[in-house]
A protein has these predicted regions:
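Internal/C-terminal transmembrane anchor helices
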Residues: 43-68
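Transmembrane helix-loop junctions in multipass membrane proteins, especially transporters and channels
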Residues: 7-10, 36-43, 66-69
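Membrane-cytosol interface at the C-terminal ends of transmembrane alpha helices
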Residues: 23-46
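Alpha-helical membrane-anchoring segments
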Residues: 1, 12-19, 41-52
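Compositionally biased intrinsically disordered regions enriched in Thr/Gly
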Residues: 4, 62-313
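Membrane-embedded alpha-helical segments of integral membrane proteins
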Residues: 2-30
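N-terminal regions of proteins, emphasizing targeting and processing segments when present
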Residues: 7, 17, 36-37, 48, ...
Length: 313
């Protein structure tokens, strides 16, 4: 799979570049000394020129790498140029500074769903990108830089020495049929708090029109049935039998019959629909991200006809 790299800045890489230039410099100095000994003037002139080139390369390496952040290419009018991408490629942003790291990787979708998937990626990463929603390179570069700036701001305020300020996001295709495609998105954030935060997201898109599946996939008469399925899924996750035991595992829920559906809509995989709650959404951080996969045959009685057709293989 091709990888389109945006920018990778790291002190290790910078050190290697400078070290290489220094080695070039020392080689040229040695050449000058040797030339003086054997009295070859043309060699001296050439080596002096080589020294100048070495110093110039070293300076350029430091300046270029110190710049650090990816900025999408712009045209003469200052507008961002669209990035030429091929479905299946990965767009990568990578920044590694002394206190901050930011890495975002996103697989480029097929053209027929690219805009819909890109809009979902934008929403999931922050929802503030106002450029071309089909330009995955611009989206990834924008959020990569945004989180570098955010983490640098936090770092400047002072954080414990053990804190590792970082942002990581990766989007991949995880399921596909002739009717739908599902993308999964993993996000890990460490802003120097008591513990890092994570998200496990997914979204299924119709190949026919790019429509993203949402909770409206459930029929009006099927809502109660789906809520009961979700409650059963939570009992399995927490390994409890009764409603009373389940309530001890949840937070912000009044009773076991009013458990809210996850904010993240179900998404399709090979085994069925994935139901997942994010950290802190319904339980303590230590509980992780409660959820599981509900088989298609179990969900089908509660789905609208449009979605039922999408589940057929």
């Amino acid at each position: 799979m091709a990888v389109i790299a945006t920018m990778n800045e790291s002190k290790d890489v910078m050190g290697i570049a400078v070290l290489g230039a220094c080695v070039m410099f020392l080689v040229q100095v040695a050449h000058v000394v040797t030339s003086v000994i054997v009295k070859r003037g043309w060699c001296i002139a050439g080596s002096v020129f080589g020294i100048a080139v070495s110093l110039f390369v070293s300076l350029c390496s430091v300046v270029a790498l110190a710049a650090g952040q990816y900025r999408p290419p712009v045209n003469a009018n200052g507008a961002v140029e669209p990035t030429e991408l091929v479905a299946g490629d990965s767009v990568t942003f990578s920044f590694a500074g002394s206190d901050v790291t930011s890495d975002i990787v996103a697989m480029v979708p097929e053209k027929n769903v690219r805009r819909a998937v890109s809009e979902w990626l934008d929403e999931s990463l922050g929802g503030t990108f106002d450029g071309d929603k089909e330009d995955m390179g611009a989206i990834v570069g924008y959020y990569g830089n945004m989180y570098v700036d955010t983490l640098n701001s936090i770092s400047s305020q002072g954080v414990p020495d053990y804190a590792e300020l970082s942002y990581y996001a990766r989007m991949d295709k995880i399921y596909e049929t002739d009717k739908v495609v599902t993308y999964g998105l993993t996000i890990d954030i460490d802003m120097g708090g008591a513990h890092p935060l994570s998200k496990e997201l997914g979204a299924t898109f119709s190949k026919a029109d790019g429509k993203r599946l949402a909770w409206d996939m459930v029929s009006k008469d099927g809502t109660t049935g789906v809520k009961n399925l979700v409650k059963g899924t939570l009992k399995d996750y927490f390994n409890v039998k009764s409603d009373a035991e389940l309530m001890k595992c949840l937070q912000g829920v009044k009773n076991a019959n009013s458990i809210p559906l996850p904010k993240t809509p179900p998404y399709m995989t090979e085994e069925g629909f994935v139901i997942i709650y994010q950290q802190y959404e319904i339980s303590a951080y230590a509980a992780g991200m409660p959820g599981d996969t509900i088989p298609y045959k179990t969900m089908k009685p509660y789905l609208i006809d449009e979605v039922l057709k999408l589940t057929e293989k």
